[in-house]
């Protein structure tokens, strides 16, 4: 099922900055928030407990990639934090992804990163030594993710349709790199607007700087949310 709330990427360096940012929103508004490496390493597990205590949903974006037993043990800890979604690198392999699923359990969604949206095809071929097209690599990883029993993948919006065709229509496609028209793309190589992401079939979208660095973050969030959901029945 699609998530009507854009996921806000809390790419902040400290707990205090997060508190200041969230204070801009009405206390009763339930948000979907992404905690990435920078914030998690700065604030620790307490940041997840804090956000959950405020009634928000949390996507813990740590992209685990290690031997299966280590990932399984780490996922057991993350399940105790009450995260709503977390992820691994599909490149870790099917056995690692199966171990992650076992460790996390079924209470939270588990997705895999195929290729980072900052990766171009030329970079993939040169540095990863993968001599296929970028799309072929993404589809391969998506199929392996489905085989491992995960809920979906992180992918660019341009790849959503082929991934769902290669797996199944209910396979989650979470799309970062979402930018409203006219906003700078930053370090993302493959970007799309919220409306385009909806039309192409994305289930979740992640938006960072267009909200967090906006002059009015609350207004920016609601404008993006409105664009994302404008054609929903």
Curated annotation (Swiss-Prot):
Instruction: Tell me if Lyase is a UniProt keyword of this record.
Output: yes
Which catalytic reaction applies to this protein?
orotidine 5'-phosphate + H(+) = UMP + CO2
Q: Its biological function? A: Catalyzes the decarboxylation of orotidine 5'-monophosphate (OMP) to uridine 5'-monophosphate (UMP).
> Which CDD domains does this UniProt record tie to the protein?
OMP_decarboxylase_like (cd04725)
- UniProt keywords, alphabetically: Decarboxylase, Lyase, Pyrimidine biosynthesis
Q: Which PROSITE patterns match?
A: OMPDECASE
Q: What is the E.C. number?
A: 4.1.1.23
Signal recorded as keyword: no
Q: State whether it acts alone or in a complex, and with which partners, per the record.
A: Homodimer.
Gene transcribed to yield this protein: pyrF
Biochemical pathway: Pyrimidine metabolism; UMP biosynthesis via de novo pathway; UMP from orotate: step 2/2
Protein name per UniProt: Orotidine 5'-phosphate decarboxylase
Q: Where does substrate bind?
A: 11, 34, 61-70, 117, 179, 188, 208-209
What does the record list as GO biological process?
Answer: 'de novo' pyrimidine nucleobase biosynthetic process; 'de novo' UMP biosynthetic process
């Amino acid at each position: 099922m699609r998530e009507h709330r854009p996921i806000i990427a809390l790419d902040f360096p400290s707990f205090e900055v997060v508190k200041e940012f969230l204070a801009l929103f009405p206390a009763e508004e339930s948000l979907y928030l992404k905690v990435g490496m920078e914030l998690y390493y700065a604030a620790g597990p307490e940041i997840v407990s804090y956000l959950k205590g405020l009634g928000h949903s949390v996507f813990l974006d740590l992209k685990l990639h290690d031997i299966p037993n280590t990932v399984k043990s780490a996922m057991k800890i993350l399940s105790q934090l009450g995260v709503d979604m977390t992820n691994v690198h599909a490149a870790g392999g099917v056995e690692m992804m199966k171990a992650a699923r076992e460790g996390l359990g079924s209470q939270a969604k588990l997705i895999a990163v195929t290729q980072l949206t900052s990766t171009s095809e030329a970079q993939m071929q040169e540095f990863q030594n993968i001599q296929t097209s970028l799309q072929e690599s993404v589809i391969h990883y998506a199929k392996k993710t489905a085989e491992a029993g995960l809920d979906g993948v992180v992918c660019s919006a341009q790849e959503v349709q082929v991934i769902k065709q290669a797996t199944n229509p209910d396979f989650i496609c979470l799309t970062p790199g979402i930018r409203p028209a006219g906003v700078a793309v930053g370090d993302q190589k493959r970007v799309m607007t919220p409306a385009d992401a909806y039309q192409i079939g994305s289930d979740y979208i992640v938006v960072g700087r267009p909200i967090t660095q906006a002059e009015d973050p609350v207004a920016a969030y609601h404008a993006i949310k409105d664009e994302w959901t404008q054609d929903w029945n």
